[in-house]
Amino acid sequence: MRIVELIIDEKDETSGIDAVSVVESPAIESDFIALKKHEIELKEVDAEKRILMGAALIPNKQIYRKNDKNEEYYIYFSEETVRKASELFFMNSNQNNATLEHKQKLDGMSVVESWIVEGSHDKSMNYGFNFPKGTWVISMKVNNDEIWNKVKLGEVKGFSIEGYFADKYEMSLVNEDEILIDKIKQIITENENN
């Protein structure tokens, strides 16, 4: 089966992640955890924080896909692409863009924390995760009662990114074509000057 590396096309303004979707079955096969505040004061439990934490992208994780021609293949993102995607997500002010199952736009959802796992002592381990180096981890504040209820019922379990990426192989073909066209232009120009 074909394996395709997806990259960010830096010449394309639309390339990158537009939103984070909360989904029942995340393609990266990593569920988030719901963080709650459990401080007990005078025998009272404080209100829930309503924060979800989990992986947004895991580098080199093969993700199964099937296109409209019924062709099956896997995609993956390199560590470099994961880092670029996480940076562009915030540079383009997309931290308040969220959807449910990639269909319904959601209000009251914000990515409030984000980092790239850099080693074996990453803080995500404090929450029971064991992500590989280069994983983009996010924490999302949920001020949406409907979604928070879905979290508590186990109807949404993880994050899934939404965005536009280029196929590295197809991009290399485009670059080869551009090089060939430039060589042809150069030959034509040289012939015209002679």
Where do the model's predicted regions map?
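Signature of dsDNA virion morphogenesis modules
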Residues: 1-191
